[in-house]
């Protein structure tokens, strides 16, 4: 029925993509399910959003048993692959529904208020909340994607979906579908396989989290494969260091870009265009490599203090936004919705600032600020110089309880293979 929560629980798989589009066409609300999360946490979320249908990959049959037992709202469970033990497969489900009349959702306005997806938040401060993303929100995201991610060159598009489609990569597929682009689906990320696909399948667009982007940069094939088909490598979901941007331009050419958004304002609150990255890497406004780009045309952004006042240009505050990209709120969580929508704005929970040219800079998550000895320390400001050290692959800085200072700063560092660095060396390099 219209508005039913329809969960798709699968690794990257062509049938999973088909199920997402089919659910939307039938009027359901797509619920992406993280295959890396525990069965119990997935069951908790699916029960919360009152899931009616669950489409799953056979490799997850054991976890499905846990979910079914804990989700009383379920009406049907369908396996999207070959599984002799499944009560129903995608083939039998389609045969059974062959003559079912699909409602015509088309109207002159595209039913903008209908819920497209109940997207889980990151759950960093508790159980995930279900973000009610409407058709109107997605149309806005697609329009922004067509403008900033695809542009005028719409012929012969080949998009490689290699990041999990249970996250932003799943929503991006729809942008390419609107212009008849081809999407290749890789079940998981392998840097060598991605580079091979770019060369042999003439991939034009790819979306990657920073860790995968770094793996591509460091792979020996990155400098030997023919990657000339690439038009954009969109890196998002976490900050990218300026040095990694510069290396990306050297290795891949002027195709690397970055965007900023969140489930509550999907994907494109701001966009750091490839030409801006390339220019900044060459020395024209190099500070822009620290930004997440200019605010997009359909979105209004303000930097607010805790009382809802706009702070002066260049000063730090909470990044807040409004416009047709911002979602309706959280499923069955009116208090959480009200808390995020104060002073007439959606509050992202991110601390940042705007410059005079409308470039947006993110400093840190508001809740990730470390207070040590009465001083406010943003984790990203400690992470940045560590990430700039040769041999450092990844870094995360956290605050840990400290009897003297309240909190002390701890850095968790992952080194490139074969690199040896002692903690004292890192501290000596980054300490003021």
Predicted regions and their residues:
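Structural core segment of the AMP-binding/adenylate-forming
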Residues: 1-2, 25-96, 417-423, 428
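Short beta-strand->loop structural element characteristic of the AMP-binding/adenylate-forming
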Residues: 7-9, 16, 20, 24-55, ...
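AMP-binding/adenylate-forming catalytic core of the ANL superfamily
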Residues: 8, 16, 37, 54-56, ...
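Conserved pre-ATP/AMP-binding loop-to-beta segment of ANL
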Residues: 79-85, 98-120, 127, 151-158, ...
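Conserved AMP-binding A3 loop
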Residues: 116-143
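Conserved AMP-binding/adenylation subdomain of ANL enzymes
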Residues: 139-158, 166-205, 219
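Gly/Ser/Thr-rich phosphate-binding loop
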Residues: 178, 203-208, 217-287, 300, ...
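Conserved ATP/PPi-binding loop(s) of AMP-dependent carboxylate-activating enzymes
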Residues: 294-298, 309-339, 375-377
